[in-house]
Structures are given as C-alpha cells and as structure tokens.
Amino acid sequence: MSEKLFDVLPLYVANRDCRKRTKINQGGTSSGKTYSIMQLLFTRAMEKCGQVITVVGQDIPNLKKGSYRDAKNIRNASPVLQKWFPKVNEGERIFYCVNGSIIEFNSYKDAQDAKNGKRNILFVNEANGVPFDIFWQLYIRTSDEVFIDYNPSARFWVHEKLLNRNDVQLFISDHRQNTFLTPEQHAMIEGIEDDELWKVYARGATGAITGLIFPRFNVVDALPPREEWKMNV
C-alpha cells in the first residue's frame, strides 16, 4: 500500500508493533486511544484476506456514539479506505473489505449470547461497561489479537484478572500525547477542578469509586465464623 491512509499518533504505532496478544489501552479523555485502535483495525483488515474483526461495546447506542462513529469518520476521510471498504451495512454495522475481511460492531446481552461466533481480532471498547463473563467468552473465541480500552474511573476486571498476565501489554495515554487536539481542548481538560476526576481524565491514572459511605474497605473471599464477629446483646 503506497498511498497514505491517514495521520496517526504514537499510540497507533505502539499498538501496531506490540507482539503481545492482548493490548490494554488505559487512558484519559481525548487521548486518542479508541480512534487509534480503530485506525489499526482497518489496517489489520487490509493486511490479510478474510479477517473477522469484532468490536464490542456495552450496548448498541454506546457503540454508535463511540467506536462505530469513529470508524465511519476514519473511512469517510480517506479515499484509500473508501476503495478498500466500498460497502458499509448500516443496519448490521459491518464494514466489508474487498479482500473478504469484515469489521463488525456488536454488543451481547449475556455470556451465552457471546458464545456465538469466532473471530481473528477482538476490540472491547470502554471495557468497564462490559461484564467479565461476556469478555471471557469472546476472548477464548479470538484467535489472534485482543485490544481493550477504557477510562480508568475505578478498578475493575482488567486490573484484577488481566494485567498480571505475561501475554498482556498495558499502554497508558492522556490528552497531552494527542497532537490533533486544539490548545483550547487541552486547556479544558487540564482545567478539571475535581482532583479525582483530573487524575482519571487528564492523566489516565486509575481512580477510586466516589460517593461511598465507607470509602476504605477490603474485599474478602468469605466471612470468618459467626462466633468471631457476632454481637452479644
């Protein structure tokens, strides 16, 4: 492919060149993580014939406002991609490549629903809105690569079940690496006043759950015997 597809951020290159099976993209708002992954999925679809690439979100409305909208914008801005992906089924949310590859966008109501279908590449968009049991069914039916992205408003199954695996690479990004933003957009994000929200959305750091009556707690596998904690009245 000698023609230029699109301009990319360093995050695109980092994900493209990573040899780990699972690429986790934790980031603040407007870091370019979803957009960069969608650009890469177009590239992956073009590189090999007959690829099945599945993009998963919490539900269809969120997909349409997020990664699916990004995908349409990326394709529509590139004459080269329009030649490679001449057909888009809006009803089924599928991009068809001339080499037989497809990029499909879907959500799943439960783990049983997620057992249907296999794929070469999986992208779980805003993964903290997708239950782990659904992710797992999709993950074990994916042959090649898995991409995950999210805003880290609080710890969830990615932190507990994936980050300690040897086949996982974590990328942390924030708006400062997104050179396509305007100075006003950067300033707006930097101007977030709440410290916890600033940490999450301006720096891509993992936040804590807010609004809890008991903000400090530990999760245990089981309670001790009742005789050790019951109250005598």
Language model regions located:
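Pre-Walker A adenine-sensing motif
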Residues: 1-21
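Pre-Walker A (Motif I) flank of P-loop NTPase domains
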Residues: 18-25, 51
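Walker A/P-loop NTP-binding motif
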Residues: 31-49, 70
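Conserved RecA-like ASCE P-loop NTPase motor core of nucleic-acid helicases/translocases
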Residues: 51-63
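Inter-Walker segment of RecA-like/P-loop motor cores
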Residues: 60-120, 206-207
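Hydrophobic residues in beta-strands of the RecA-like P-loop NTPase core, especially within AAA+ ATPase
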Residues: 123-124
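Signature of the SF2 helicase/ATPase Hel1-core->accessory helical subdomain module
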Residues: 128-178
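ATPase catalytic-site recognition across NTP-hydrolyzing enzymes
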Residues: 178-233
